Curated annotation (Swiss-Prot):
Protein name (database record): Phosphopantetheine adenylyltransferase
GO annotation, cellular component aspect: cytoplasm
Pathway: Cofactor biosynthesis; coenzyme A biosynthesis; CoA from (R)-pantothenate: step 4/5
Swiss-Prot/TrEMBL cofactor(s): Mg(2+)
Subcellular location: Cytoplasm
BP GO annotations: coenzyme A biosynthetic process
Keyword Hydrolase: no
Species this chain originates from: Thermotoga neapolitana (strain ATCC 49049 / DSM 4359 / NBRC 107923 / NS-E)
Residues that hold ATP according to the record: 8-9, 16, 87-89, 97, 122-128
SUPFAM superfamilies found in the cross-reference section: Nucleotidylyl transferase (SSF52374)
Positions bearing the site annotation: Transition state stabilizer: 16
Subcellular location, principal: cytoplasm
HAMAP family tied to this protein: PPAT_bact
Encoding gene per record: coaD
Length: 161
């Protein structure tokens, strides 16, 4: 069975990688779908995020990386995928993700959403936190791959010019 793990991945964190690897213990294949979220202002372009996701997952089998602009359920329908994977860090994540799961189910009745809780070591890690810590010169190397950390520091340095 194929499932989709969507997100903005701006940037991808080791928490995301952990969810991906754990989802692969359940599903035959996982599509990591990099999406645009109009409510988020991304630091990295869609193509930059794709490259960072590819580098973070280079040693992970049974993963397909794709990009989508538009309504998520349209992508799922077009590709005949009926399972969505979402990661949960806290109760606040659950409230939002439950609303999204119910809305997606209403739009695509065959869709099931599977929630995976974050591993304890990543339960506080978010892309927003990583960007904020890096912006102030903090060390993010325990939360992202070396390639992502490098790209993040370079991007933030460019922004200060």
């Amino acid at each position: 069975m194929v499932a989709v793990y969507p997100g903005s991945f701006d940037p991808i964190t080791l928490g995301h990688v952990d969810i991906i690897k754990r989802a692969l213990s359940i599903f035959d294949e996982l599509v990591v779908l990099i999406t645009e979220n109009p409510r988020k202002r991304c630091l990295f372009s869609l193509e930059e995020r794709r490259k960072l996701v590819e580098s973070a997952l280079k040693n992970v089998d049974r993963v397909r990386i794709d990009v989508h602009r538009g309504l998520l359920v349209n992508y799922l329908k077009e590709h005949g995928i009926k399972v969505l994977v979402r990661g949960l860090r806290a109760v606040t994540d659950y409230e939002y993700e439950l609303q999204m799961a119910l809305a997606n189910k209403k739009l695509y009745g065959e869709l099931e959403t599977v929630f995976l809780t974050a591993s304890e070591e990543f339960s506080f890690v978010s892309s927003s936190l990583v960007k904020e810590v890096a912006m102030y010169g903090g060390d993010v190397t325990e939360w992202v791959t070396p390639e992502v950390a490098r790209a993040l520091y370079e991007k933030l340095k460019e922004g200060k010019r």
